[in-house]
Amino acid sequence: MNKQIFVLYFNIFLIFLGIGLVIPVLPVYLKDLGLTGSDLGLLVAAFALSQMIISPFGGTLADKLGKKLIICIGLILFSVSEFMFAVGHNFSVLMLSRVIGGMSAGMVMPGVTGLIADISPSHQKAKNFGYMSAIINSGFILGPGIGGFMAEVSHRMPFYFAGALGILAFIMSIVLIHDPKKSTTSGFQKLEPQLLTKINWKVFITPVILTLVLSFGLSAFETLYSLYTADKVNYSPKDISIAITGGGIFGALFQIYFFDKFMKYFSELTFIAWSLLYSVVVLILLVFANDYWSIMLISFVVFIGFDMIRPAITNYFSNIAGERQGFAGGLNSTFTSMGNFIGPLIAGALFDVHIEAPIYMAIGVSLAGVVIVLIEKQHRAKLKEQNM
């Protein structure tokens, strides 16, 4: 494997390991500071909004100033964010930490993605981006597991460790990453108004609505999950880490071994509908579960539906985009970020009203997603009949 590709993968792994590390300790951390579910929603939303705003500028700056520089700046901001969260003793400091963390993600991700595109042979780009996705998932899976066990020492320790990982990634990037002499700006092109008139916007309406609705529901559930289990059955950070890591492993296994097989037998829309119905059933079981082991077992399988929906939507966008792959990817990313921003805000407020309210909302949103899919399938069937 190319040395620079390996370093880029390692950087991404460290970043997402660092993000995952802190998930199991958030309930203890919030209670220690006397914060509520609404406060947690604000912290998560601040990160998502900051990333959404900075990402386009991060991509443009990466092209103008060099991707290595933007990656390194992003890694430093990541470390600053984690150390601030570790020492923070009031809500304002934590909010500032999350804003800086979102800025770091908005710089590192476009930089890494662009650099992988630059240094990958054309026949290996798809494979390299596939590896990147798998590595991101691996960081999310291992992070909560490690963080939960670190919390046995101190609930602030995972944040210090994540900050240290950022510094390690920064040093490796300084030493081992080099900007190529020739670089591509694909994916960060300037928006030309005349191009917009050539785009068939109608084909993107339903995917955009579906992406917004689903990211809204999924982020709402995932944001409050650790707080939900801690309050409902008194899960410790270690218990939360086992639940999330187990769920992540099962989700990854289904993605790796079964997603392609399902796609041979189902269209993306049909598969999304079935995945949503599966998620609804499991979420209903979660509402009725009231003891340690039943919630642990449900936790191992609840994320499978969500983990299958995401690549299916991405695949659907890609298939309808034609030659507008960059445009479709931008729409997908933008509306996913919007959902990730709005979902935690509402879920946090609902959690303070009733512990099960965010779960009810996720169930309702998932059912709305099924309805949207059925409407889209009916619309496409009519178009197909008209074209015959």
From Swiss-Prot:
Which keywords label this protein?
Cell membrane, Membrane, Transmembrane, Transmembrane helix, Transport
Disulphide bridges: none
GO MF term set: xenobiotic transmembrane transporter activity
Q: Membrane-spanning regions, if any? A: 5-25, 42-62, 69-89, 99-119, 129-149, 157-177, 201-221, 239-259, 269-289, 293-313, 331-351, 355-375
* InterPro entries named among the record's database cross-references: MFS, MFS_dom, MFS_Efflux_Transporters, MFS_trans_sf, Multidrug-R, Tet-R_TetA/multi-R_MdtG-like
Pfam families, alphabetically? Answer: MFS_1
Q: What is its main location?
A: membrane
Q: Name one GO cellular component term.
A: plasma membrane
What subcellular compartments does it reside in? Cell membrane
Instruction: Give membrane topology per the record.
Output: Multi-pass membrane protein
* Family the entry assigns: Belongs to the major facilitator superfamily. TCR/Tet family.
NCBIfam families for the chain: 2_A_01_02
Its job = Involved in quinolone resistance. May constitute a membrane-associated active efflux pump of hydrophilic quinolones.
Provide the protein name: Quinolone resistance protein NorA
Species, as recorded:
Staphylococcus aureus (strain COL)
Q: Which gene encodes it?
A: norA
